[in-house]
């Protein structure tokens, strides 16, 4: 496995945030059954909460998928404003964009430091780059963290990730099972992770192992459906 090093500054930030934002982690022992580089963590979004909790508390090496717009300085502000900040009623409207501009350099530094893989949604040709980078990372022994919820699947006039529970999924990520098998000759394991804000708890469930005996589309849908069902059940607990 190629060692994945995070900059000292990123490690310090994680350590500090863990101290001021403590959580419990359940199910970490389940990861011992899987090989490094075969694991795809599939986590709920919960607005910004899921990514923060997962990044801080998943107990293994991984590289996260991050929307490409979150890695481009000129696009972060508007993306985060409409995805999350617009709905934060406790914050005066006139402060929202200036606050996002203030934290943009910090976010870019963090995403670079955790070796994030850009996701080019709505750009089919560029999206293939996402899959190539992911397969390269898995070949090198790095696990992957994915947040597959669709922020746009809401009633008309509304957008953004749902605050509680699990929203509808994009299912394309599940093709990584077939791709990992075809390219790296290993079975991917899709591991559900639910971040519960109310309980301050990150729960890791049993993994769903890719089955190469199934048809490509059948297996993609099976994996995506099982993951959604598992995460939805975890949200109700």
Role assignments for model-derived ranges:
Residues 13-47:
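Helix-to-loop junction immediately C-terminal to a conserved catalytic motif
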Residues 19-20, 37, 113-114, 140-141:
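Structured helix-beta-strand junction loops
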Residues 25-28, 104, 128-131:
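Structural motif corresponding to alpha-helix initiation and N-cap regions
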Residues 35-121:
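Catalytic core of membrane glycerolipid acyltransferases/transacylases, capturing the structured
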Residues 121-237:
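Non-catalytic C-terminal accessory region of glycerolipid acyltransferases
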């Amino acid at each position: 496995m190629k060692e994945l090093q995070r900059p000292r500054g990123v490690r310090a930030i994680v350590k500090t945030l863990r101290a001021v934002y403590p959580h419990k982690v359940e199910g970490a022992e389940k990861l011992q059954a899987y090989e490094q580089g075969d694991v795809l963590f599939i986590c709920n979004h919960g607005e910004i909460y899921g990514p923060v909790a997962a990044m801080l508390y998943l107990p293994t090496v991984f590289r996260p998928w991050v929307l490409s717009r979150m890695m481009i300085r000129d696009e972060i502000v508007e993306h985060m404003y409409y995805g999350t900040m617009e709905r934060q009623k406790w914050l005066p409207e006139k402060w929202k964009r200036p606050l996002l501009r203030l934290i943009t350099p910090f976010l870019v530094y963090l995403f670079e430091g955790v070796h994030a893989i850009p996701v080019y949604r709505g750009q089919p040709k560029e999206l293939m780059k996402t899959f190539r980078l992911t397969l390269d990372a898995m070949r090198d022994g790095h696990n992957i963290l994915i947040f597959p919820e669709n922020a746009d699947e809401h009633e008309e006039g509304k957008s953004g990730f749902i605050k509680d529970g699990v929203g509808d999924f994009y299912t394309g990520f599940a093709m990584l099972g077939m791709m990992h098998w075809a390219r790296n000759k290993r079975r991917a394991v899709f591991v559900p992770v639910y971040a519960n804000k109310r309980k301050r708890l990150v729960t890791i469930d049993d993994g769903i192992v890719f089955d190469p005996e199934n048809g490509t589309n059948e297996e993609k849908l099976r994996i995506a459906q099982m993951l959604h069902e598992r995460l939805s059940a975890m949200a109700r607990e």
